[in-house]
Amino acid sequence: MPGHLLQEEMTPSYTTTTTITAPPSGSLQNGREKVKTVPLYLEEDIRPEMKEDIYDPTYQDEEGPPPKLEYVWRNIILMALLHVGALYGITLVPSCKLYTCLFAFVYYVISIEGIGAGVHRLWSHRTYKARLPLRIFLIIANTMAFQNDVYEWARDHRAHHKFSETHADPHNSRRGFFFSHVGWLLVRKHPAVKEKGGKLDMSDLKAEKLVMFQRRYYKPGILLMCFILPTLVPWYCWGETFLNSFYVATLLRYAVVLNATWLVNSAAHLYGYRPYDKNIDPRQNALVSLGSMGEGFHNYHHAFPYDYSASEYRWHINFTTFFIDCMAALGLAYDRKRVSKATVLARIKRTGDGSHKSG
């Protein structure tokens, strides 16, 4: 395994955590130290079966004017209607029953975990493994979130990591806050996104029947889980008004989930410190982490995309890590990959911006 030693830390018999330890600085040959030069994007990866989310600094944008934007008017209209409906939903919150507000919040949390613990840390990055009951829960939660099916989301996200801040990055933050937040969903993909994304190895997800099942039945799935169910449950179960159910539990909740996720692509790439790698754009943003339940420690995540915690500090403003650890305690999650403290400190010293408390 290039550049790393693996140690298996056994907690209970059903739970393992793979810890990444820093490699030796060189190897001895004929009594002398032979220094090996290893590209940074290969030096710190620990998954021999997974390279598609590792940053490739050799890729550069082609020179020349960017292609003309092609607006997707269907998406523009639907997003506008959603957010107008969500704003109206805010005015209805005071008239909602307490159960409706609690239901909307729980639905929000489950949806966020379908993104953070599900399509992001499990399926996009393979930072841990999940047994079938947990995978079923996460695929349902991901469908509730309605942010494209797991296969498409993971393909775009792997391209985002591998070709970060280039035209092959689906939500390139160097094209501005609005584009990286939501604008990328309102226009046709840049040709480089299609070209490079189409060449990524997605065989792991193609081989997973659950992921392909969701993709096959995604449209009826989102209609049921994202819109029909959250509207009918408050209305039918505790007599909430239909308008409150639709505008608060459905539209407002859905809009909040979307924007909490989008802020990881926009704000967490533009605002904050870069204690782990000052040479990349992603930042540490605690407010983003609060809304996304752990995805805002973005400089760390792009430096170590294979760490299941997506943060140096595990449970600190990181409910998703807490959730995964709880699932591990129940025997539903295992092989959680974790970067060792020594490796983190070495990276801070080598490429950090000096803002880390370790100095």
Curated annotation (Swiss-Prot):
**Annotated motif Histidine box-2: location in the chain?**
157-161
Q: Which residues lie on this side of the membrane: Cytoplasmic?
A: 1-72, 119-217, 264-359
Q: Name one GO biological process term.
A: monounsaturated fatty acid biosynthetic process
Q: Which cofactors must be present for this protein to function?
A: Fe(2+)
**Main enzyme class:** oxidoreductase
Tissues showing expression? Detected in skin, but at lower levels compared to Scd1. Detected in the middlle part of the sebaceous gland, but not in hair follicle. Not detected in liver and brain.
Give residue numbers for sequence motif Histidine box-3: 298-302
The cellular location(s) given in this protein's UniProt record come to: Endoplasmic reticulum membrane; Microsome membrane
Task: Extract one GO molecular function annotation from the record.
Answer: palmitoyl-CoA 9-desaturase activity
User: What InterPro entries does UniProt report for this protein, alphabetically?
Assistant: Acyl-CoA_DS, FA_desaturase_dom, FADS-1_CS
Which residues are reported to carry the modification Phosphoserine?
S203
One Pfam match: FA_desaturase
May I have one GO cellular component term?
Answer: endoplasmic reticulum membrane
Which reactions fall under this protein's catalytic activity?
hexadecanoyl-CoA + 2 Fe(II)-[cytochrome b5] + O2 + 2 H(+) = (9Z)-hexadecenoyl-CoA + 2 Fe(III)-[cytochrome b5] + 2 H2O
Binding-site positions, Fe cation 2? H160, H269, H298, H302
Q: What is known of its domains?
A: The histidine box domains are involved in binding the catalytic metal ions.
Family from the record: Belongs to the fatty acid desaturase type 1 family.
Protein name in the entry: Acyl-CoA desaturase 3
Q: Which organism is it from?
A: Mus musculus (Mouse)
